[in-house]
Amino acid sequence: KGEFIKKISRRAKYILIKFNNGTLVMHLGMSGSVSVVPSIEALKKHHHFELVLDNATSMRFHDPRRFGSILWQNNNEQLNLFKNLGPEPLSSEFDDEILYLSSRGRKKNIKTFIMDSNIVVGVGNIYASESLFQAGISPKRAAGKTSKKRYQALTQCIKIILSEAIKNGGTTLNDFSNIDGKPGYFSQVLSVYGRN
């Protein structure tokens, strides 16, 4: 009570809500969602957290599968959650050089490699499949045996695919919805994900 929201941001799959005394750290898990609704609206099943705002609205965390989490970080605390995370894929810190150098000596396949959040965050199964297809790279190819030229193409494709997904409101396959409760439409333009 009496706290002010100073900033809302994101790091990897974490939503960060900065207050005067600390930061609320939310992870949506597999099927969690956040919505902003009138405070008088009744709580629904699987609403596990409510932040009541002073404008008669509430931010609610809905998590039917209970894979999500909510943590509080005091201003003077460092959370280990972010320590080993790779760069954001749409940031200038993410480039083909980082991917190429990180891949040297790795035997795992390239799809698993780019889905590793220690390498780059935010490239999940759908976006890895689509990016590799667009770059013309087999997902089974060994990460350590992939050329720098292929990593240049892959990096560009990751950035394009993720930008397109954001522009289309995300990818709704089962139960994903954005903060307004609307589905994402990127699933309508998927080239390979979910196909045999």
Where are these regions (language model features)?
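Generic beta-strand structural signal
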Residues: 10, 18-19, 53
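Basic, nucleic-acid-binding surfaces and adjacent catalytic neighborhoods in DNA/RNA-processing proteins
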Residues: 9, 102-196
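Phosphate/anion-contacting hairpin/loop surfaces
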Residues: 24-122, 127-134
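Short, solvent-exposed polar/charged micro-motifs at secondary-structure junctions
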Residues: 16-18, 71
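Short, surface-exposed charged micro-motifs
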Residues: 7, 16, 50
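A glycine-biased structural micro-motif
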Residues: 1-6
